[in-house]
Swiss-Prot record:
Organism: Mycobacterium tuberculosis (strain ATCC 25618 / H37Rv)
Pfam family, one: Transposase_mut
Protein name: Transposase for insertion sequence element IS1081
Keyword list, A-Z: DNA recombination, DNA-binding, Transposable element, Transposition
Segments traversing the membrane: none
Family as reported in the entry's similarity comment: Belongs to the transposase mutator family.
Source organism phylogeny: Bacteria, Bacillati, Actinomycetota, Actinomycetes, Mycobacteriales
Length: 415
């Protein structure tokens, strides 16, 4: 064969890698990882896969699958199982994301405490927990706790944080020999550059005024400033804490939570009509039209459903706080839906554990999940543009409580 027909494999590989094809990188990583684990498993068995040898001391017994997150992609890794004993690659454990390492440490803690459920047994097998010693679990937990503590107590120096959202999750934990519910308080905000941040996380016994007050005081002590609007549900303790610690900030009552509150106060047959009227308020093109439509909705409800009209009228100022800001960002600030999506991501991890062994493990796992989300937000696209953020801050100095504006000429109701 002449040289013109020879393939320069080294150059071919270099060319392929230069293309940065995700499929290629994923394939190369999968092949390398499989070969590495196969070699380690063969070493434990004393002979190669299916090799006849007098030195063989163990045999393969199938595989167990788990996801391995890498910068190239998430790879399905087939970990060799052995007939006697177990094999789990230490390097795979060390390379896990913070959130998965936190999950492993929490499950391992439950395992070492003797918690025995079908779900826990499956987790123990999947995560390779049986191979971890008590000292390894302790070291892993200590490292994660230090990282999470540094994250949740860091200075909030990227402000002003013009927009803030707060919510709480109820999680179960074992305390004093029984299972109790505790509240995990979470706050997010938009910094001066338009990126979302996780601002804080705390665990309290109850979602009361004292818990929220301590939470917001901690945020302020760490540097939280420039907050113009806080979006949340209408929990009395939360609203009171906002007023006490952020007196210059307006409060936006989450429209989604309010709709549920209004539905509870509305006769069931009338709810479809009332819901349509409520949605029509938010469908207006500008702040003036929103206020005018609010008046028309109240007029329409007063005669037929006076209690519903009173309920809506009482919530007026808090529901329309968003109108003080540019319309381009109304969807981001008039409800807690972005926060709820974050909560679902946290729930996806915490539901795996179910009942936590202690409060420290809650902070470890939830804190690790939030720290990863924080990094993704900071490294991703801006949540709000700089131009609209500038206009939002400027609007505060030129407009005061537009939701209280009165309309003299009210045309017919629109839906």
């Amino acid at each position: 064969m002449t040289s013109s027909h020879l393939i320069d494999t080294e150059q071919l590989l270099a060319d392929q890698l230069a293309q940065a094809s995700p499929d290629l990188l994923r394939g190369l990583l999968s092949t390398f990882i499989a070969a590495l684990m196969g070699a380690e498993a063969d070493a434990l068995c004393g002979a190669g896969y299916r090799e006849r040898s007098d030195e063989r001391s163990n045999q393969r017994n199938g595989y167990r699958h788990r996801d391995f997150d890498t910068r190239a992609a998430t790879i399905d890794v087939a970990i060799p199982k052995l007939r006697q004993g177990s094999y789990f690659p230490d390097w795979l454990l060390q390379r896990r994301k913070r959130a998965e390492r936190a999950l492993t440490s929490v499950v391992a803690t439950c395992y070492l405490l003797g918690v025995s459920t079908r779900r826990m047994e499956r987790l123990v097998e999947t995560l390779g927990v049986t191979k971890l010693s008590k000292s390894q679990v302790s070291i892993m937990a200590k490292e994660l706790d230090e990282a999470v503590e540094a994250f949740r107590t860091r200075p909030l120096d990227a402000g002003p944080y013009t927009f803030l959202a707060a919510d709480a999750l109820v999680l179960k934990v074992r305390e004093a020999g029984r299972v109790v519910g505790v509240h995990t308080l979470i706050a997010t905000g938009v910094n001066a550059e338009g990126y979302r941040e996780i601002l804080g996380i705390q665990v309290t016994s109850a979602e009361d005024g004292a818990g929220w007050l301590a939470f917001f005081r901690d945020l302020v002590a760490r540097g939280l400033s420039g907050v113009a609007l806080v979006t949340s549900d209408a929990h009395a303790g939360l609203v009171a804490a906002i007023g006490a610690t952020l007196p210059a900030a307006a409060w936006q009552r989450c429209r989604t939570h309010y709709a549920a509150n209004l539905m509870a106060a509305t006769p069931k047959p009338s709810w479809p009509w009332v819901r349509t009227l409520l949605h029509s308020i938010y469908d207006q093109p500008d702040a003036e039209s929103v206020v005018a439509q609010y008046d028309r909705v109240l007029d329409a409800l007063t005669d037929k459903l006076p209690a519903v009209a009173e309920h809506l009228d009482t919530a007026r100022t808090d529901l329309l706080a968003f109108t003080a800001f540019p319309k381009q960002i109304w969807r981001q600030i008039w409800s807690n839906n972005p926060q709820e999506r974050l909560n679902r991501e946290v729930r996806r991890r915490t539901d795996v554990v179910g009942i936590f062994p202690d409060r420290a493990s809650i902070i470890r796992l939830v804190g690790a999940v939030l720290a990863e989300q924080h990094d993704e937000w900071i490294e991703g696209r801006r949540y709000l543009g700089l131009e609209v953020l500038t206009r939002a801050r400027a609007a505060l100095t030129s407009t005061e409580e537009p939701a209280k504006q009165q309309t003299t000429n009210t045309p017919a109701l629109t839906t």
